[in-house]
Curated annotation (Swiss-Prot):
Disulfide partners: none
Protein's name in the database: Peptide chain release factor 1
Keyword Ion transport: no
Keyword Protein biosynthesis: yes
Lineage: Bacteria, Pseudomonadati, Pseudomonadota, Alphaproteobacteria, Hyphomicrobiales
Region (Disordered): 284-309
Length: 358
């Protein structure tokens, strides 16, 4: 049988009863929304606990029948035959409940800001950045998420030197957070006459989109500078100082937005800054929680080489979990679920091991 934290289970059951009671006492709209949200979060956990308790009860009844010498022998045989299937159901439900009880990432249900930057490899790296952005865009559309480009800098022969976009929807960050890191591509460039394979790289940063309630940016902690926006080759695209640079003084984080609307640039720069500051706080909590964890999955370390896309072999390898798939074309078309589910599973296994050790 799986070891379950009984004290925590009792606390959750008690909390669920309190929420149910408070929701029926006509709270104001704001309180009701908060209670309903917590209720929805706890409901699958409580349903799993109740289903398990029912199975425990059935097993106890069957064991009573089996051990009662006064009971008809045929009834005892039937009970003996039924017992293994119930134990199997219990084992499965206990594992599911264990996953439900794992520590939650506070940002999992949020939308995400995805930043892709070309690394080593010049024009090839920019083209690869474009491939990665289209991959995430298609993955997002398949999940009915909304994609909006915040800013971009195009490569000389296509793709992007840098592109930043928001991907909005429920639980976006819980899936895409595993994409942070260095992505490497191996392929023969179209301009390569000798048929040699070139290696290029791009860095992906996935940040949870933060609300004002999540992170408080004090006016005295930021410096806002305006400057002339420039187009390709440095020429001025308009006559007003529309570009905005926001510097967060305590951390030194700097965000620049250079589209045509100064108002929009300011709003988007603050949006990115808020996400970066929120991610710093989140990473602190995660690093404290996982100091003893060996798995790097979900660590968000952007200097870590996480995945290689090998075009000649049609192969994609995720180095964190040693997963290799020979369906590069489908993955670049947005078929990422197999990789992401494997990463989530590995992360959950690491958390379970951590719980067992504690």
């Amino acid at each position: 049988m799986v070891s379950l934290p009984q004290d925590r289970i009792k606390q959750l059951e008690k909390r669920f009863e309190i929420i149910e009671s408070q929701m029926t006492t006509n709270p104001n709209a704001e309180t009701y929304v908060k209670l309903a949200s917590e209720y929805a979060e706890l409901q699958p956990v409580i349903a799993s606990i109740r289903a398990l308790n029912a199975l425990y009860g059935e097993i106890t009844e069957l064991e009573t029948i089996i051990n009662d010498k006064q009971t008809d022998i045929e009834m005892r045989h039937l009970a003996q035959e039924e017992l293994p299937s119930l134990h199997k159901k219990v084992e499965q439900l206990e594992k599911e409940l264990q996953i439900l009880l794992l520590p939650k990432d506070v940002a999992d249900e949020k939308s995400a800001i995805v930043e892709i930057r070309a690394g080593t490899g010049g024009s090839e790296a920019a083209l690869f950045s474009g491939d990665l952005f289209r991959m995430y865009e298609r993955y997002a559309h398949a999940h009915h998420w909304k994609v909006e480009v915040i800013s971009l800098s195009e490569g000389e022969v296509g793709g992007y030197k840098e592109i930043i976009a928001t991907i909005s929807g429920k639980g976006v960050f819980s899936k895409l957070k595993y994409e942070s890191g260095v992505h490497r591509v191996q392929r023969i460039p179209e301009t390569e006459t000798g048929g040699r394979i070139h290696t290029s790289a791009a860095t992906v940063a996935v940040l949870p989109e933060a609300e004002e309630i999540d992170i408080d940016i004090r006016p005295e902690d930021i410096r806002i500078d305006t400057m002339r926006a420039s187009g390709a080759g440095g020429q001025h695209v308009n006559t007003t100082d529309s570009a905005v640079r926001i510097t967060h003084i305590p951390t030194g984080i700097m965000v620049v937005q250079a589209e045509k609307s100064q108002h929009q640039n300011r709003a988007r720069a603050l949006q990115i800054l808020r996400a970066r500051l929120f991610d710093i706080e989140r990473q602190k909590v995660e690093s404290e929680r996982s100091a003893s964890r060996k798995s790097q999955v979900g660590s968000g370390d952007r200097s870590e080489r996480i995945r290689t896309y090998n075009f000649p072999q049609g192969r994609v390898t995720d180095h964190r979990i040693n997963l290799t798939l020979y369906k590069l074309d489908r993955i670049l078309e947005g078929d990422l679920d197999e990789i992401i589910h494997a990463l989530i599973s590995d992360h959950q296994t690491a958390l379970l091991m951590e719980m067992d050790n504690n």
